[in-house]
Amino acid sequence: MGCVPRIEFGCSSQSLTLSWNLRAWNLCRLNTISHFQKLPYPLVASTRKHYKNSLLLKRFLVGVGTEESSLSEDLLDESLSRPLTSDELKSLLIDTERSKLVKKLSEANQQNRFLKRQLKTQEHEITNIKTELALMELEVQALVKLAEEIANLGIPQGSRKISGKYIQSHLLSRLDAVQKKMKEQIKGVEAAQSKEVHVFWIGMAESVQVMGSFDGWSQREDLSPEYSALFTKFSTTLFLRPGRYEMKFLVDGEWQISPEFPTSGEGLMENNVLVVE
């Protein structure tokens, strides 16, 4: 005997499925349409009914998918064609300006790091030049002493003169001039070399930083606290070349002037003055 086809109708939250689960049929009895027509009428009617339902369901699912796709495209077109509101425009402008400022700040930091590396290289070269000049000055000083001894021994008979002076006296005067010139060069090198400068702030605070014209007001230098029974002293060491600088302290997020240093300017333009000799 043949087995009756079992029809499964399943529903889920994501999709609807219609499936036919045909159990094993006796193919010998269903090899022609006449055999199918001999099935009981209720079974045939039920089979036709479920077949129609499956077609309707397929059409419904295709329609729903098409409507959803069309709806999403319509929403996208509407959002693109709709003009920006004032708040959206302000937010867009703020984001654009923020991106520009971040880019400029990054470029400034890169330039600052490059200049610092160059400064360290120049400081090293200046130190080497100063050392070489100091050694040369010692040698010239020894030659000056030797020339003085020769001049003090007296002028041998037959000694020639240069510019109205005997060669012994002429040599001594020339060595003196060279020694003075080298001392001036050493002073110039020392003026170009950075010096340690102690900067401090006295008062009660959690954090203290200093900025100044010594680096173009681009970096904040942190000051370390030193506690005592009477007060708190924040200090740091800067390496600066001789000159006049202006600076200001950032104390707990507020710009302040230290009474320990002289000032220049008025109002918001008032700054402390730092002189490096």
UniProtKB/Swiss-Prot annotation:
PANTHER family: PROTEIN PTST, CHLOROPLASTIC. Residues 1-44 form a transit peptide. GO terms for cellular component: chloroplast; chloroplast starch grain; chloroplast stroma. CDD domains: E_set_AMPKbeta_like_N. GO terms for biological process: regulation of starch biosynthetic process; starch biosynthetic process. It comes from the Eukaryota. One of its GO terms (molecular function) is starch binding. It is found in: Plastid, Chloroplast stroma. Keywords: Chloroplast, Coiled coil, Plastid, Transit peptide. Disruption phenotype: 100-fold reduction of starch-bound GBSS1 protein and production of amylose-free starch. Involved in targeting GBSS1 to the starch granule. Was originally thought to be a carbohydrate-binding scaffold protein, but it has been shown that it is mainly found as a soluble protein and that interaction with GBSS1 is a pre-requisite for subsequent starch granule binding. Dissociation from starch as a function of pH, Mg(2+) concentration or redox state is not observed. Interacts primarily with amylopectin and is required for amylose synthesis. Changing residue 255 to A: Loss of binding to starch. InterPro entries: AMPK1_CBM, Ig-like_fold, Ig_E-set. Contains a C-terminal (199-277) carbohydrate-binding domain (CBM). It comes from Arabidopsis thaliana (Mouse-ear cress). This is Protein PTST, chloroplastic. Residues 95-152 form a coiled coil. Interacts with GBSS1. The keyword Coiled coil applies.
